[in-house]
Amino acid sequence: MDGPLTVTQTLAGDQMVVWASTASPYPVTLSWNELGERPQPVVLTPGQPRELASRVLALGHAQTMYQIEYVWAPGAMGIREARVAHPLSDPMEMAQGPHGDFSHQGKFAYDWAVPEGTVIRAMASGWVIEVEDRFTDGGLGSAMRDQANYIHIIHTDGSIARYVHLMPGGADVSVGSFVTEGEPIGRTGNTGFSSGPHLHVEIVRLNSDIWPETIPITFFRRPTVAQDIP
């Protein structure tokens, strides 16, 4: 067992069967192989064990176990695009879009220049899987590239939203918590590789090497709820 992932081998009659399952509430992707064989990626969904392999044991032979290697990551493959709620309440012009020349080359990523401390809202419901908000500085030096504050949230389809450049202490959620679409999750800042206060968002899927890659996003505005005025 490895965290929320379990890989087991069981004897069923004359067959040795390899099973994989996840205890997490969201999809995970497992890349596994027998020693010397090519890795095979498999998406595991909650509550649905998957048979990875089986072999018939020769009569009179010992119960030969599979020799297996595997790695895994939260998320799913095959997601083509995302349609999600806008992460900011007030309409504003995008400062840099997908494949932007400044820092979005080869990426579907989206930036909005907003004052530090602007509330960030969850683009879709999901589980918080990573949080970093201890960094304090920002700038354009190469050392800044790994010093951005961020929140990562995985959705029910296995896509993962990344909210980046939060202010110091700007995360209002913690790892393991479930958030709903539109819920405040943090506050914008200017940490990491940044030329000024802004919010950077992207949504990723996993490829067959279980490496994240960004996907196109369509944003919609949440409707404003009218309130009765006495």
Locate each region found by the language model:
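Surface-exposed, glycine-biased beta-strand/turn segments
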Residues: 43-147
